[in-house]
Amino acid sequence: MSSRILVTGGSGFIGSALVKALVRGGHKVRVLDDNSRGAPRRLTDVEKDIEFIAGDIRDASAVANAVRGMDEVHHLAYVNGTEFFYTQPDLVLDVGVKGMVNVIDACRAANVRKLILASSSEVYQTPPKVPTDETAPLIVPDATNPRYSYGGGKIISELMALNYGRKHFDRVLIFRPHNVYGPDMGFEHVIPQFVVRLKRLAAQHPSGRLPFEIQGDGSQTRSFCHVDDLVRGVLVMRQKGEHLGIYHVGTTEEVSIGEVARRIAAHAGRDIEFKPRPAPAGGTERRCPDIT
């Protein structure tokens, strides 16, 4: 059955992939994005099949206009990228919290009673158990560390979605993606950053092992999920998920950050020598979802 769906942050990395999948599924899709972080080129393949509204998620009137006439809202608009967490935590929280308030208010005003929220594995910070299931505590270990602006904002968003959802929505679903990667993901994340750095080092050092700086000793692990797999998981959740349900979307293969660097270097036929440097406060040693 075709639905009218608003995707906020729809020109972003994950948002655009979701938009394309929804269009392929026969849905009528509207996108709200100010393209401050997203890129219109990501939607070129479907630009004739969607309605695009240029607007800031913090602008209540823009959000209200975008929500009006929809059957459901998929809220993905946010500021991602570790550098922003440390350098612009006020922006991260402004977009995250105001955006969530505006989406809920607009849905209530327009009687849109279906909401899907993109959360994050960052809500766990350092989880007490790995693999981590969806019932693990959500914490902000140090409110003075700007690193937690992102995870803290996501926790607030989840609390709002769940508690408003009990009274004002028929269906609220939350997904927590884990370290998503794929084409055109931008340069704010570990895989593309490593590619750029290794390319530069290879040009500077035509032979021999590449001196590669890494936070700590590179033993920190993550479970990376391709964006296409993430979208498939979100669509399954949309179809089968329970009201007020929270779902991990990811894989269970843990890979060390050092191994990520080694694999990228190997594609260029090079070896690397790690140069450890201090990791910023607030990092997580292990992150892997329980997806059972």
Where are these regions (language model features)?
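N-terminal Rossmann-like NAD(P)+-binding domain of SDR-like oxidoreductases, especially those catalyzing
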Residues: M1-V180
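C-terminal substrate-binding subdomain of Rossmann-fold SDR/epimerase-dehydratase oxidoreductases
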Residues: L18-R24, G55, R200-T292
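Residue-level signal for the nucleotide or nucleotide-sugar donor/cofactor binding architecture
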Residues: G38, R58, T87, V95-K98, ...
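A short, amphipathic alpha-helix embedded in the catalytic core of nucleotide-handling enzymes
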Residues: V103, Y164, Q193-L198, G233-M237
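A glycine/serine/threonine-rich, flexible loop-to-helix segment
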Residues: K129-T132, F187-V195
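Short, cationic motifs built from Arg/Lys/His that form the positively charged side of catalytic pockets
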Residues: K154, R176, P183-D184, R222, ...
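Hydrophobic alpha-helix immediately C-terminal to the catalytic Tyr-X-X-X-Lys motif of short-chain
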Residues: I156, M160, Y164, Q193-F194, ...
